């Protein structure tokens, strides 16, 4: 059981104090496009990405309190104001706090691969989730997935072309091991230093489906 560390940061939100769905225009004080990172870890990816896109508002969620604390500290240290951090379980948070059709982008980097065959049904990104998250992406919204686990990357790459309402932005490739302009987290860099390959997948929503 994780130890809950109090987080005193202007960038940390209590999901129970948000509406259903949340009024993100009020939260950020503007109506800029909204993007979501699921599993922000220590916040290095979202911090760099937010700096690159100052006119986009980012929500960074993580189930682990320690990661949320480190992410908030990083944002404060670098003066990044277009990110808000929430400790939450992904699916529940999305259903309760995100309006359908409102997300300009979703980023999922190196989620738990659940490597044992009997546990693979626990993986976050599967066909059911991809159908689910499409409802929350805006038309032309981007879906990014990255993993260092070969089986996970190959599995997602294999089923994504059959998912209605998405276009492959890396075609004719179904995945790539490098993605120009996409920031690497500390964990990605560690995996690559160990000789592992990162699988990058990028799709965009279409009017179909």
From Swiss-Prot:
SUPFAM superfamilies: S-adenosyl-L-methionine-dependent methyltransferases. InterPro entries: SAM-dependent_MTases_sf, tRNA_(Gua-N-7)_MeTrfase_Trmb, tRNA_methyltr_TrmB_bact. It catalyses: guanosine(46) in tRNA + S-adenosyl-L-methionine = N(7)-methylguanosine(46) in tRNA + S-adenosyl-L-homocysteine. One of its GO terms (biological process) is RNA (guanine-N7)-methylation. It comes from the Bacteria. Pathway: tRNA modification; N(7)-methylguanine-tRNA biosynthesis. Its EC number is 2.1.1.33. It is an enzyme of class 2 (transferase). GO terms for cellular component: tRNA methyltransferase complex. One of its GO terms (molecular function) is tRNA (guanine(46)-N7)-methyltransferase activity. The active site is at residue 112. Catalyzes the formation of N(7)-methylguanine at position 46 (m7G46) in tRNA. Belongs to the class I-like SAM-binding methyltransferase superfamily. TrmB family. This is tRNA (guanine-N(7)-)-methyltransferase. It comes from Geobacter sulfurreducens (strain ATCC 51573 / DSM 12127 / PCA). The gene is trmB.
């Amino acid at each position: 059981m994780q130890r809950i560390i109090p987080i005193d940061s202007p960038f940390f939100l209590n999901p129970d104090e948000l509406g259903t769905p949340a009024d993100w225009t009020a939260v950020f004080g503007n109506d800029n496009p909204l993007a979501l990172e699921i599993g922000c870890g220590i916040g290095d990816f979202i911090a760099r990405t937010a700096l690159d896109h100052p006119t986009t508002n980012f929500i960074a969620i993580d189930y682990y309190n320690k990661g949320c604390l480190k992410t908030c500290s990083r944002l404060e240290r670098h003066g990044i104001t277009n990110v808000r951090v929430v400790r939450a379980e992904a699916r529940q948070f999305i259903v309760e706090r995100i309006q359908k059709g409102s997300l300009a982008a979703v980023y999922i980097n190196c989620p738990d691969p659940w490597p044992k065959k009997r546990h693979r049904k626990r993986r976050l990104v599967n066909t059911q989730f991809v159908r689910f998250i499409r409802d929350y992406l805006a038309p032309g919204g981007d879906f990014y997935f990255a993993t260092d686990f070969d089986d996970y990357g190959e599995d997602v790459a294999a089923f994504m072309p059959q998912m209605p309402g998405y276009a492959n932005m890396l075609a004719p490739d179904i995945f790539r091991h490098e993605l120009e302009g996409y920031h690497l987290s500390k964990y990605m860099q560690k995996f690559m230093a160990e000789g592992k390959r990162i699988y990058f997948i990028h799709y965009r929503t279409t009017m179909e489906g």
